[in-house]
């Protein structure tokens, strides 16, 4: 089986006597309140989804990730995973200290941060290098600008897993997915990341990929997305419909990806691929404008970025697909690589156009969206 990124699967979950000891000591520690995105990141670090990270980046790691897409030791990592606090909060913390991490929604202790460093950064520099723009209209840049100014670096120890009340059948840790992949006997597995409901173009890409590997690992993102994106519960239902009716169940598995969208385009494509590698995938589908937003990135920038690295240091093989469509003359799904006909013969709808139709209670063309899926989406969008 493919090794996790960095060579081993990180596990920062503490149990038994060590856990009880940390809980007792936590009462004397300074406290920091985390929002849902921050606590989700803590959980993902602890379970190994973000391997090789063991905590939030120190300044040396942060600067190298921002500038070179590498950690301080040279390991490829493309998105800075950081924890920001106010200057007032930071003044009450000392480097070398343990800090209790609490969830703002229930005031419960979830983890301990072993604080190594307090530091500042230049948000505009981060925005320009990570997102390719300093415009606040970009949702990822907006989050960087509103983040508290002092960053805390250090390893974490997880006391309690983050509790979810949705999609629990599809919430598996990398250790659990790797065990399932072993049980299925899959030697090669292709991962597919999406924040959209399933449509025929994605189905076409997935099935093309499945022709060449043992298993398909569908991984819908269920963390924070833009308000205009279709809600996660509706998206998951759309996948359940097609998995039940149109996919070989013994060659597919669906595991939700519990992380927020950064909309970092090419850099996020690398990040998404590395996380699927940690789940046990050997291949990863990269389509048009992966993790993009608006017109900030070129159509295939997210594919080209993989060429900047030695394939061995990425470790997971990108499968690069052009955008696909229904061709009336071909009589089926195709792409620019396989179809000789003009755009006049192609049926393709943007996500914006599809969402508009669904909100109006209208079904998109059956060539682009299966009627069974359209019904689920219309019902969900009109609730």
From Swiss-Prot:
Q: What class of enzyme is it?
A: transferase
**EC?**
2.7.7.4
Database matches in CDD domains:
ATPS
At the top level, the lineage of the source is Bacteria
Say if the entry is tagged with keyword Nucleotide-binding: yes
Q: Which UniProt keywords apply?
A: ATP-binding, Nucleotide-binding, Nucleotidyltransferase, Transferase
Q: Which HAMAP family match?
A: Sulf_adenylyltr (MF_00066)
- Which protein, by its recorded name, is this? Sulfate adenylyltransferase
């Amino acid at each position: 089986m493919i090794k996790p990124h960095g060579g081993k699967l990180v596990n920062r979950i503490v149990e038994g006597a060590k856990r009880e000891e940390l809980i007792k000591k936590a009462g004397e520690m300074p406290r920091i309140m985390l929002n849902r995105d921050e606590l989700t990141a803590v959980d993902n670090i602890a379970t190994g989804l973000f391997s090789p990270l063991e905590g939030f980046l120190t300044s040396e790691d942060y600067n190298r990730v921002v500038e070179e897409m590498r950690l301080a030791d040279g390991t490829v990592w493309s998105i800075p995973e950081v924890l920001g606090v106010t200057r007032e909060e930071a003044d009450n913390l000392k480097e070398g200290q343990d800090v209790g991490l609490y969830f703002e929604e229930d005031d419960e202790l979830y983890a301990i941060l072993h604080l190594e460093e307090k530091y500042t950064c230049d948000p505009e520099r981060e925005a320009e290098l990570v997102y390719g723009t300093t415009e606040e209209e970009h949702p990822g840049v907006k989050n960087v600008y509103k983040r508290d100014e002092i960053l805390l670096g250090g390893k974490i120890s997880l006391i309690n897993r983050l509790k979810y009340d949705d999609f629990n059948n599809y919430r598996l840790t990398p250790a659990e997915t790797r065990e399932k992949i072993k049980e299925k006997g899959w030697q090669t597995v292709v991962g597919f990341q999406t924040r959209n409901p399933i449509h025929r173009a994605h189905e076409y890409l997935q099935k093309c990929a499945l022709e060449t590997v043992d298993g398909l690992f569908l991984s819908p993102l269920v963390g924070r997305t833009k308000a205009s994106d279709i809600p996660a519960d509706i998206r998951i239902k759309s996948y359940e419909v097609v998995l039940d009716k149109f996919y070989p169940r013994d060659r597919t598995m669906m595991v939700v990806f519990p992380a927020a969208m950064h909309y970092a385009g090419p850099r996020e494509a690398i990040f998404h691929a590395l996380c699927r590698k940690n789940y046990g995938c050997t291949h990863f589908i990269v389509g048009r404008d992966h993790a993009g937003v608006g017109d900030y990135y070129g159509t295939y920038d997210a594919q080209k970025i993989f060429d900047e690295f030695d394939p061995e240091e990425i470790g997971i093989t990108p499968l690069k697909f052009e955008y696909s469509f229904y061709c009336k003359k071909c009589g089926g799904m195709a792409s620019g690589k396989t179809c000789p006909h003009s755009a006049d013969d192609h049926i393709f709808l943007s996500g914006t156009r599809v969402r508009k139709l669904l909100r109006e209670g209208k079904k998109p063309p059956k060539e682009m969206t299966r009627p069974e899926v359209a019904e689920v989406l219309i019902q969900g969008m009109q609730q």
